Amino acid sequence: SFEGSQGSGTAALELTLDIPLLHARDTKVKGIVTLEENVLAMPWPVPPVTDLTGRVTFTEKGAWAERVTAKAFSRDATLNMHTEEDGTISLAFSGLAQPRSVSYFNNNPILAEALTHVKGETSYVGAVSISPATGVSVSVQSDLKGVSTDLPSPLNKSAGSVWPLTFAFSNAGSGKTARHRIAVNVARNRFSGIVEVPAEGSRVSPRGSFAVGRRTYLPRSGFALEITGKTLDADRWQTAGEALIAAAKKLAVTGDTEGGATLERVSVDLEE
């Protein structure tokens, strides 16, 4: 649903109501909202959009839209929307984004440090599902063309090279064990990361793992940093690794979670 959303701007509404005199609960609704450079802020994790322009049709059962244009993360985007039979709202979108936009979903110190070595912007396609049963999920794919890095091998990338990226945000658990899960994979495990953070009201501790040169998995607790490779530049990776480890040490948290989240494991594996 759009509960908790806030919007502003100029819009035109066409509305038709069919209200049975003896059965008002069976009222039928049909309408069209024409948006012109509107602003829409939905609850996290859906990013806010500006310059929202296009037509949205709706009934008592849901909403639909095609080729609505907007700006997300200050870059052009296009979206389509439809409502499933079970009430799930599905958004399909595409556009341009800068890598640092990922930090909107989780401003993890390790991820933030890694993103300081990345510049440029790239095209993407993605989907948002807003389900009455499972909440909000987000998935994004990109080839990262247009993005470059100044990290050591195997994470040194030129702007013209193609590195497939997948990003996923989902929910797990409920009540005091409810948590958000964020997973990123770049160029088939050149870099991978997975993080779980507590949802509002949850008492679970954050945990996660980031890996270079291999696929990573959620640890039982705390955070892990793994670097694997056949030909690692020891000097350059020492500098980069020290910065990542320093960032990881900022992960200690306070609050209502059970315990804290700290860097529990660092491994470097030079493959033969």
Where are these regions (language model features)?
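Membrane-proximal interfacial segments on either side of biological membranes
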Residues: 1-71, 75-181, 194-272
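Central antiparallel beta-sheet cores of small beta-barrel/beta-sandwich binding domains
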Residues: 186-188
